[in-house]
Amino acid sequence: NPYFRTKDSASELEAAGVDLISPQFANTNVDLPALPAEAYRLVEDKSLYAVMDIGGDDRGAYALGRYTPFLLEEGNYRMAFVANPCRPLTRTPEEALEVMREIEAAGGLPFTAIVNNANLAHETTPETVLAAVPYMKKLSEMSGLPVWMTSAEETVAAGLTGKVPRLLPMKLQ
C-alpha cells in the first residue's frame, strides 16, 4: 500500500521503543488489506498497548476483522474515527458518518470516539483546525460518539493551545 507511510519512520519509532509491525508490502504499489501473522500478538499479549492504523476506508478495516473476536471478547479497546473534513470523501459530517459506518461494517467493530484531524498537509493553520470544530460537533451528535481529541502538527498546535480541549501535538515524519 503506497499510503502506509508509518514504515517511512521505522528507525525513529524503534529508537523510541516502538515495535513496528507492518505489512510485507508496505510502501509498495501492492495494496493488499493484510497484516503479518505476528500482529496477532497485539491482541493475545494483554501486557501490550497497541495502536493500529487501518487506513481511512473499509478496505483497511477488512484486515482488522480477523482480530474482532479477540477485541470484542475483551471489550478493552478504543477505536477512533480520525476525521478530516478537508479530504474529498469526508467533506461533510454526513459523508464522514457514511465512511464511519462502512468501516465499522467491514471490520465488525464499532468506533468509540472521534479525533479532529482537520488538516491541509503543510498548508494547515490553526484556523483550519478551528473551522472544523462545528463539523466535529455535528459528527459527534450524529454518531453518538465523543470527540476524544484534536490532533495537529506541532507548530499548528502551538496556535491552538487553550482553544481546543485535549490537544495532541504531533511531529510529522
Description of each model-found segment:
Residues 1-31, 35-38:
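N-terminal phosphate/diphosphate-binding loop that engages ATP/GTP or pyrophosphate donors
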Residues 19-21, 146, 166-168:
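Conserved beta-strand segments of alpha/beta enzyme cores
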Residues 23-28, 47-64:
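Switch II (G3) loop of P-loop NTPases
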Residues 43-50, 74-75:
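Glycine-rich phosphate-binding loop signature in dinucleotide/nucleotide-binding domains
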Residues 58-163:
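Conserved catalytic-core segment of NTP-binding enzymes
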Residues 160-173:
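Active-site regions of enzymes building and remodeling cell-envelope glycoconjugates
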